[in-house]
């Protein structure tokens, strides 16, 4: 999860925490907690982009260490119904962690969305996960 506190139109501070489990990774469990700064690079009616950098602490099965995190997020509303999003996260450490998530979503109605999503992860094992998604707003 992430907490965001705006400082002005462009700058904000963040508090981050995450839990990740992967049975194929040497360190099955990853818990990250930290704080940092975000900057809104671009904000238009159709496009949004942000970059965030933070200092965090990683708790993992075999090693606990301070890390640096950096993420870039970009969203483009191609039309009223079609949206493209890309989120990239890098974390330093004994084993660097990289995750890039790319998705295309199509709104069937105001409350129902279908989409295609690919998540690439390297930690240090590389793999891709492709999903067909269904989203429902309540």
Q: Which residue ranges define each predicted feature?
A:
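Repeated loop/turn-to-beta-strand initiation elements of outer-membrane beta-barrel proteins
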Residues: 10-13, 44-49, 78-84, 106-116
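Glycine- and aromatic-enriched membrane insertion/assembly motifs of diderm outer-membrane
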Residues: 1-21
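Solvent-exposed loop/turn segments connecting transmembrane beta-strands
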Residues: 21-29, 59-66, 90-98, 121-128
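Outer-membrane beta-barrel "beta-signal"
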Residues: 105-107, 126-138
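Residue-level signature of outer-membrane beta-barrel architecture
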Residues: 5, 19, 39-41, 57, ...
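Hydrophobic, lipid-facing positions within transmembrane beta-strands of outer-membrane proteins
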Residues: 1, 17, 31-35, 66-72, ...
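Membrane-embedded beta-strand positions of outer-membrane beta-barrel proteins
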Residues: 15-17, 35, 51-53, 86, ...
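Detector for outer-membrane/organellar transmembrane beta-barrel domains
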Residues: 32-36, 40, 44-91
């Amino acid at each position: 999860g992430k907490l965001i506190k705006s400082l002005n139109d462009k700058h904000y501070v963040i508090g981050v925490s995450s839990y990740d489990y992967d049975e194929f990774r040497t360190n099955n469990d990853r818990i990250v907690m930290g704080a940092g700064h975000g900057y809104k690079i671009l904000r238009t009616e159709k496009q949004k982009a942000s970059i965030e950098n933070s200092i965090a602490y990683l708790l993992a099965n075999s090693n606990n260490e301070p890390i640096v995190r950096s993420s870039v997020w970009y969203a483009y509303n191609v039309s009223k119904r079609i949206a493209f999003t890309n989120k990239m996260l890098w974390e330093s450490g004994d084993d660097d962690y990289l995750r890039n998530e790319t998705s295309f979503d199509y709104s069937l109605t105001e409350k129902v969305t279908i989409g295609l999503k690919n998540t690439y992860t390297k930690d240090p094992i590389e793999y891709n996960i492709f999903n067909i998604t269904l989203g429902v707003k309540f």
